[in-house]
């Protein structure tokens, strides 16, 4: 047993050493890449208006710039501080990932609940229907979920007749109502996805924006009651975050230097 323990420990040490080497190599490559990009594109460009005029005698009510005949737009460039450059670069990368995962999640979040409701345990009356359902779904999972639902329903009936409504009763109620809750969440998520999509189209993709839409809705709700607009805004933001998580779980991706795998 002791020799085996030393063998396992040695194997882990070897893996740990290789992992540290990979981390050092990855950090070195990232530092070199960031330094190169900062040296090449680490500038901030500002569009300014250039005014030029001849020199005139200055009085209390006259400035030479007011009589200038040329108005030229030019660009002024300056070296950006390294922290500002890092923030801007990370913002660009996060915006791309946010757009990808959020777009996928807005579709998968309601669809996953729709499929969960569609594949819920159903009452099987004939042998032909039973064979058809078992051919389309996993037999073990369906039978287990159906038995659990049947047992919970019978337990509810017994406890309701006996007047006992403890923790077990509430747990069984939750199991029985889970399918209906899934359908209600599906309708809610689908509505939120459609509203977000409409807002992106009419306010962000159209230039100039055609209509403020959600911005105006939040303002009106906030004027109706102090916390109503804030609460609604928080719900929409929370749904957007959940959409990004759902998109990452279903999509996953492989970048140039690292991989982002679907979560489990």
Curated annotation (Swiss-Prot):
<keyword id="KW-0812">Transmembrane</keyword>
<dbReference type="Pfam" id="PF04791">
    <property type="entry name" value="LMBR1"/>
</dbReference>
<feature type="transmembrane region" description="Helical">
    <location>
        <begin position="96"/>
        <end position="116"/>
    </location>
</feature>
<keyword id="KW-1133">Transmembrane helix</keyword>
<protein>
    <recommendedName>
        <fullName>LIMR family protein SELMODRAFT_416716</fullName>
    </recommendedName>
</protein>
<dbReference type="InterPro" id="IPR006876">
    <property type="entry name" value="LMBR1-like_membr_prot"/>
</dbReference>
<comment type="similarity">
    <text>Belongs to the LIMR family.</text>
</comment>
<feature type="transmembrane region" description="Helical">
    <location>
        <begin position="225"/>
        <end position="245"/>
    </location>
</feature>
<feature type="transmembrane region" description="Helical">
    <location>
        <begin position="194"/>
        <end position="214"/>
    </location>
</feature>
<dbReference type="GO" id="GO:0016020">
    <property type="term" value="C:membrane"/>
</dbReference>
<keyword id="KW-0472">Membrane</keyword>
<feature type="transmembrane region" description="Helical">
    <location>
        <begin position="23"/>
        <end position="43"/>
    </location>
</feature>
């Amino acid at each position: 047993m002791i020799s085996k323990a030393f063998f396992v420990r040695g194997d882990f040490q070897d893996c740990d050493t290789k992992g540290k080497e990979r981390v050092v190599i990855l950090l070195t490559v990232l530092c070199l890449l960031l330094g190169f990009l900062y040296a090449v594109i680490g500038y901030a460009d500002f569009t300014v208006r250039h005014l030029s005029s001849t020199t005139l005698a200055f009085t209390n009510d006259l400035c030479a710039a007011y009589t200038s005949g040329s108005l030229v737009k030019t660009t002024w460039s300056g070296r950006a501080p390294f922290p500002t450059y890092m923030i801007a670069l990370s913002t660009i990368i996060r915006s791309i990932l946010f757009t990808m995962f959020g777009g996928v999640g807005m579709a998968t979040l309601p669809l996953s609940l729709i499929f969960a409701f569609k594949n819920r345990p159903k009452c099987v009356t004939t042998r032909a229907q039973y064979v058809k359902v078992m051919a389309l779904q996993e037999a073990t999972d369906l039978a287990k979920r159906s038995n659990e639902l049947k047992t919970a329903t019978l337990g509810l009936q017994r406890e309701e007749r006996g007047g006992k409504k403890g923790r077990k009763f509430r747990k069984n109620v939750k199991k029985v109502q889970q399918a209906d809750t899934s359908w209600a969440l599906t309708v809610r998520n689908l509505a939120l996805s459609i509203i977000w999509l409409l807002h992106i189209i009419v306010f962000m993709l159209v230039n100039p924006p055609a209509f403020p839409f959600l911005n105006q809705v939040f303002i009106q709700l906030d004027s109706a009651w102090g916390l109503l607009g804030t609460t609604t805004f928080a719900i929409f933001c929370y749904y957007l975050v959940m959409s990004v998580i759902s998109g990452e779980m279903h999509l996953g991706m492989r970048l140039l230097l690292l991989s982002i795998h679907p979560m489990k």
